[in-house]
Curated annotation (Swiss-Prot):
Molecular functions (GO terms): acyl-phosphate glycerol-3-phosphate acyltransferase activity
Role of this protein: Catalyzes the transfer of an acyl group from acyl-phosphate (acyl-PO(4)) to glycerol-3-phosphate (G3P) to form lysophosphatidic acid (LPA). This enzyme utilizes acyl-phosphate as fatty acyl donor, but not acyl-CoA or acyl-ACP.
Protein name per the record: Glycerol-3-phosphate acyltransferase
Main location: membrane
Top-level taxonomy: Bacteria, Bacillati, Mycoplasmatota, Mycoplasmoidales, Mycoplasmoidaceae
Swiss-Prot/TrEMBL keywords: Cell membrane, Lipid biosynthesis, Lipid metabolism, Membrane, Phospholipid biosynthesis, Phospholipid metabolism, Transferase, Transmembrane, Transmembrane helix
NCBIfam families xrefs: glycerol-3-phosphate 1-O-acyltransferase PlsY
Class of the enzyme per the UniProt entry, highest EC level: transferase
Length: 252
């Protein structure tokens, strides 16, 4: 009976409670909060009017841009880790149910709502960022190996195209499918022991489809939020981002 209760509470936690607090934490948009607190301005009124790292860097410089990036990345890491801690230590729920389903994979479900909160924050009239950094944080918790590949991929595409928006969309799409590849799809909170992961690929494949779906939804949100950027790229009006050289004056 205790196990049935734990399993039921685990479903309530991962499918109802976690999405709620994940959305609220996601709604704490770092760029808006930092610009209001430190500059007495709303970043959404300047340059691209986007509440994200790229625009913060463009308007206020690299230091605030990097701080924004860090804070937006850690949001899904915090929400998913919190869910995992409650699931494992407070509820003491079994990881693998009698039907063979590893319920622990559902701790990642709330990450989607962290990204939704970042893009549509309830605290800021539902006008937030585009979810790139938060997607990155989500990916780190799901698959750190693919996350590293994603960072390298994004930088390479950015160096070639000079478009951060395009780089983010392509990287999100690629990494979404990379988690399906055995050998690099190590999911920490699902496969707690790396050695066991390597020797149980059938178990890995079962859980991978869930996180793939979670990432696919998240990547779709990210791409949708970039719809104006897609139009700007098509009309050659998109602002360029230069990593290792000064930005041309005509690109300000």
């Amino acid at each position: 009976m205790d196990q049935v209760y734990s399993v039921a509470m685990a479903y309530i936690l991962t499918l109802i409670i976690s999405p709620l607090y994940s959305y609220l934490i996601g709604s704490l948009n770092a760029s808006i909060i930092l610009s209001l607190l430190l500059k007495k301005q709303d970043i959404r009124h300047f340059a691209s009017k986007n509440a994200g790292m790229t625009n913060m860097t463009r308007v206020y410089g690299k230091k605030l841009g990097i701080l924004t990036l860090f804070l937006d990345i850690v949001k899904p890491i915090i929400t998913i880790s919190l869910t995992y801690i409650i699931y494992k230590y407070a509820l003491n729920a079994p990881f693998v149910l009698s039907n063979g389903f590893n319920q622990a994979i559902l701790v990642y479900f709330g990450g989607i709502f962290t990204i939704i909160g970042h893009c549509y924050p309830i605290f800021f009239k539902f006008q937030g960022g585009k979810g790139v950094a938060s997607y990155g944080g989500f990916l780190i918790t799901i698959d750190p190996i693919v996350a590293v590949i994603g960072i390298i991929t994004l930088l390479i595409i950015l160096l070639i195209t000079k478009y951060m928006s395009l780089s983010a969309m392509i990287t999100a799409t690629i990494t979404c499918f990379l988690v399906l590849i055995p050998g690099i799809n190590y999911i920490p909170y699902y496969n707690e022991h790396f050695v066991e992961y390597l020797f149980d690929l059938n178990h890995v494949i079962k859980g991978t489809w869930y996180v793939w779906l979670f990432l696919l939804i998240s990547a779709s949100i990210l791409i949708y939020r970039h719809k104006t950027n897609i139009l700007s790229i098509a009309t050659k009006q998109e602002r360029k981002t230069f990593l290792f050289q000064p930005k041309p004056k005509n690109n300000i």
